[in-house]
Amino acid sequence: MTDQPADDAVASARLLVAYVSEDEELDHVRDAATEIGRRSGAKVILYDRDSASAFSDPMPNQWASQAEGAQFGDPLSDQELVKLGREPFAAKVAAAREAGVDAWGWLASDHGTDAVVAYARDHGADLILLPADLEEPGLAERLKGETVDNAVEEAEASATGLVVVLVASDGATELAAGRL
């Protein structure tokens, strides 16, 4: 994580995680992540929120065939995503790579933005990109029916932590006031 001013953190990002979907709903977040990654040279992990399921894990688990889970990395390449049956999402990762970005994917196993924040922190991300209009309880326990923007504003206003970039549906980006 970073302790530089937020504007500098975006320009000098080495790793960013973007909260995206398999369909077109959050393509504006994916596009913004691709652009920031292309400009800064950052590694981009597209975090697929749609893969979370109450009934199954998107990744092989201890009940899978012998060593099946060991064949996949973290994060996942577009080829690994295809092997896991996630072709539409794999195509998004491949498109970002074709645009010159060091792009990877990850399949959410838990619902909500708390899971993507935890993933970003665990992987040492500098930035996290979230849709500005997302209304979902849970973001770091701060969302109670409010928008992501309101939750981030309530986050501790410190100089350290995960820099949050909010992406509007028209693709405009804005740095959130607080860090997570």
Locate the predicted segments by residue.
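Structural beta-alpha unit
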Residues: 1-10, 94-128, 171-174, 180
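Small/aliphatic-rich secondary-structure junction motif
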Residues: 7-73, 165
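Short beta->alpha connector loops
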Residues: 22-25, 109-113, 134-135
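Short, hinge-like loop/turn segments at secondary-structure boundaries
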Residues: 61-65, 122-124, 146-147
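Well-ordered alpha-helical segments embedded in enzymatic catalytic cores
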Residues: 29-32, 88, 115
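Glycine-rich, Arg-bearing micro-motifs that act as flexible, cationic patches
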Residues: 127-157, 173-176
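A short acidic, glycine-rich active-site loop
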Residues: 68-87
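Short, well-ordered secondary-structure micro-motifs
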Residues: 28, 56-59, 117-118, 140-141, ...
